[in-house]
Amino acid sequence: MSFFDSYRKKMQMPSKEEVLPGRVQPIPTAAAHFVSGHPLKGPWPDGMKQVLFGMGCFWGAERLFWQVPGVYVTAVGYAGGITPNPTYEETCTGLTGHAEVVLVVYDPKVVTLNELLALFWEEHDPTQGMRQGNDIGTTYRSVIYTFNAVDRAVAEKSRDAYSQALASRGLGPVTTQIADAPDFYYAEDYHQQYLAKNPDGYCGLRGTDVSCPIPLAH
């Protein structure tokens, strides 16, 4: 396979016939958040809400959100594909269909979904399709997965507002997928809160320098 054929393949979602089979049992992961000590898989306090963000390599994206006041816990994992309970190595092949994502569990009385969305839009480039900077492939696509119809509508409205802001600067279009939350598979222990364990580790987050115009209260 030539370089160009290989590149083109990495930019395409796999077919059902191509995806890896995965496994029935979840892969082992951490029980608690390395920074906060809160349970990674719950139970969480009453009133917490959830959202999944994919914005390239999940190491830097997770650190972005665990630092936000009102975010109770974060975890990295895989979502949006077909392969059940994938490993990191399998996901990197592009043959699971999954994106690297961050689960954000937050208290809406302290931080709003719009505030989290503003961070999402401003801290990566949502116009790059199946890549994020030097990280190339469907694994690194931009996604927002919400857990109810109201939150999905809020996310879509924020996308429309940010699309206009980008267009005014000659940028776009936005390629971010917004959809109902699919199954979320926790990543391996060593990926959880990676940049807290490895402060000098890789972080590929790069924004567009365009501010998000959405109202932060919702």
Swiss-Prot record:
Signal peptide extent: none
Organism domain of life: Bacteria
SUPFAM superfamilies noted in UniProt: Peptide methionine sulfoxide reductase (SSF55068)
Reaction catalysed by this enzyme: L-methionyl-[protein] + [thioredoxin]-disulfide + H2O = L-methionyl-(S)-S-oxide-[protein] + [thioredoxin]-dithiol; [thioredoxin]-disulfide + L-methionine + H2O = L-methionine (S)-S-oxide + [thioredoxin]-dithiol
A GO term from the CC aspect: cytoplasm
UniProt entry keywords in alphabetical sequence: Oxidoreductase
Keyword Oxidoreductase attributed: yes
GO biological process, one term: cellular response to oxidative stress
EC number: 1.8.4.11
Enzyme class of the recorded protein, top EC level: oxidoreductase
Enzyme active site: 57
One Gene Ontology molecular-function label: L-methionine-(S)-S-oxide reductase activity
Family affiliation: Belongs to the MsrA Met sulfoxide reductase family.
Function of the molecule: Has an important function as a repair enzyme for proteins that have been inactivated by oxidation. Catalyzes the reversible oxidation-reduction of methionine sulfoxide in proteins to methionine.
Protein name per UniProt: Peptide methionine sulfoxide reductase MsrA
Species for this entry: Brucella suis biovar 1 (strain 1330)
